[in-house]
From Swiss-Prot:
GO annotation, biological process: translation
UniProt source species: Enterococcus faecalis (strain ATCC 700802 / V583)
Name assigned to this protein: Large ribosomal subunit protein uL18
Summary of subunit composition and partner proteins: Part of the 50S ribosomal subunit; part of the 5S rRNA/L5/L18/L25 subcomplex. Contacts the 5S and 23S rRNAs.
A Pfam family it matches: Ribosomal_L18p
Lineage summary: Bacteria, Bacillati, Bacillota, Bacilli, Lactobacillales
Molecular-function GO terms, alphabetical: 5S rRNA binding; structural constituent of ribosome
A GO cellular component annotation in the UniProt record: cytosolic large ribosomal subunit
Chain's role: This is one of the proteins that bind and probably mediate the attachment of the 5S RNA into the large ribosomal subunit, where it forms part of the central protuberance.
Keyword presence, Ribonucleoprotein: yes
Keyword terms of this UniProt record: Ribonucleoprotein, Ribosomal protein, RNA-binding, rRNA-binding
Family membership: Belongs to the universal ribosomal protein uL18 family.
SUPFAM superfamilies found in the cross-reference section: Translational machinery components (SSF53137)
Keyword Ribonucleoprotein in record: yes
Amino acid sequence: MITKPDKNKTRQKRHRRVRNKISGTAECPRLNIFRSNKNIYAQVIDDVAGVTLASASALDKEISGGTKTETAAAVGKLVAERAAEKGIKKVVFDRGGYLYHGRVQALAEAARENGLEF
């Protein structure tokens, strides 16, 4: 019998492979993305200290409704603003094993437009 591969397991495998190559420092932290069916979450992480420096999600009160792509763009803008408050300009983008398309792309472009460099 042919078994269908689990999409989330293959994504996690991709993410582990990428995480072996990418890590964030205090000078250039990692912008990590997690995407669920309804919401999207973004964190700016210093992997050396193991600390989250800034975060934003679709569940934040500042973000209003709209399509999932519009919400992702709003999350990107918000995480860029919160990172700028902490003096963070440069980050390493970690797409979390997701394809750079749709909500992930909208979040990344909004973060770039609002001052994050990656």
